[in-house]
C-alpha cells in the first residue's frame, strides 16, 4: 500500500492542467451500454474509479481499446452478460449506474449492491424506486438487485423525494429507451448531468429542461441508441482543490483547462476570504491574499457550495483569521477528516453536522490517515503548510479521484514522495 510523504512550507508557483471529470466520465461510460455502435470517449482521467468502471464494462462483454492514456474506444454491440458481480461493483458506488442502461436495453439484469467511500447513507432506494416507476420488477436477492421488465420500460413521472445525482443519471439512461415520455421531477442539476444529457441527445434521445430540476425525456423507439464520440468536461472538484492548494499556501497559481461557471460557488467563497482571482474563459489565476478572513459554508446541491469541496475548505480554514463554520447538509458522517486535521494541530470542534474551525493555526507535520476521497486531498493541503514532514496513509482513496496528484503538485515546486508502506 502506498503513502505520501510531504515536506511542508515549500513555496509554490506555476500552473496546473485539470483532468477530465471523473463524475462525468462514470455515467457516460455506463451509458455506452445503451449503444449498438463503437464510441470514442476522450479526456478520461487516469484514476482508479475509471479503471474499475472500464473493467466492469469489459466483464459485461464490452470490447475496449485505449487509444492513448485518456481516450477509450469501446463497443457494446456484442454484450454477452447482464450481471454486474460483487467483486467488481464493491470497489465503487458508481457501479450502480449500470442498472438503468442494462435494464433498458436487455429487459433484465443482476447488479450487486455497491461499495465506495464510507461517508454515510447513500441509499440505492431512490434508484430502485425510479426503475419501478418505469415498470420494472425489483427484488433484492443475496446482495444483488434483480431487475426485470419483460415488456420493456414505459415512460412515466419519476419524483425524487431527495435530490440524487446518480439517481437522476440512472433514471435518464433508463428513460432513453423507455416507450413514451418520462418526466424526472426534483432532478439534480450538476454540469455532469448536463453532459450526460448531451451524450444521450447525440444518440437521438429528446431531452427538455437540461440544467433545470425537471427533465422531460422522450425515449427512442429502438432497442439501442447510436451514441456519438464525446470529450469529458474538466473536473470542477479537481479545479477547486488546486485553487485551494494556492489558497492554503497563499501562492500565485494558474489553473488551466476549466469551465469557471461550473465552480462559481467556490470562486465566490475564495474572493470573500480575501483572494484576488483572474478569471478567464478556460483558466483561473489565484493571487496571494494580504489577509485571509474566516468564512461560513453550508453545503448544498449544485449550483450551491459542493459537498465534495467541504474538506478542502476545512483545511483552508485553519489558515484563516477568526472562526469559520462549515455545515454539511448532504451527507452524514462526512467530517472524518476533522480528527486527522487535529493531529496536525488544527483547532476544530464538531457538533452533529456543523464544524467550527478557529484560526489561524500553525500546523505541524504528523502521520495522518485518509478516510475517503475528498478527505485525503484535505490532508494533503494541510500537509503542504505544516511545519516539517507529514505522511498521508491510505491514499488509495486519493487515487480513486485525483490523477497524478503528487506529480501535478511537485510541478508547482512541492516536495511530495509516493512511497510503499513497510
From Swiss-Prot:
Entry keyword Transferase: yes
Pathway listed: Cell wall biogenesis; peptidoglycan biosynthesis
Catalytic activity, EC: 2.5.1.7
Positions with a binding annotation for UDP-N-acetyl-alpha-D-glucosamine: 93, 122-126, 308, 330
Catalytic site: 117 (proton donor)
Location of 2-(S-cysteinyl)pyruvic acid O-phosphothioketal modifications: 117
Catalysed transformations (reactions): phosphoenolpyruvate + UDP-N-acetyl-alpha-D-glucosamine = UDP-N-acetyl-3-O-(1-carboxyvinyl)-alpha-D-glucosamine + phosphate
Pfam name, any one: EPSP_synthase
GO biological process, one term: peptidoglycan biosynthetic process
Transmembrane segments: none
Domain of life: Bacteria
Transferase in keyword set: yes
GO molecular function, one term: UDP-N-acetylglucosamine 1-carboxyvinyltransferase activity
Location relative to the cell: Cytoplasm
Coiled-coil ranges per UniProt: none
InterPro entries assigned: Enolpyruvate_Tfrase_dom, Enolpyruvate_Tfrase_sf, MurA_subfamily, RNA3'P_cycl/enolpyr_Trfase_a/b, UDP_GlcNAc_COvinyl_MurA
Annotated Gene Ontology cellular component terms: cytoplasm
Keywords, sorted A to Z: Cell cycle, Cell division, Cell shape, Cell wall biogenesis/degradation, Cytoplasm, Peptidoglycan synthesis, Pyruvate, Transferase
Binding site for phosphoenolpyruvate: 22-23
Similarity section: Belongs to the EPSP synthase family. MurA subfamily.
Function per UniProt: Cell wall formation. Adds enolpyruvyl to UDP-N-acetylglucosamine.
Name listed for the protein in its UniProt record: UDP-N-acetylglucosamine 1-carboxyvinyltransferase
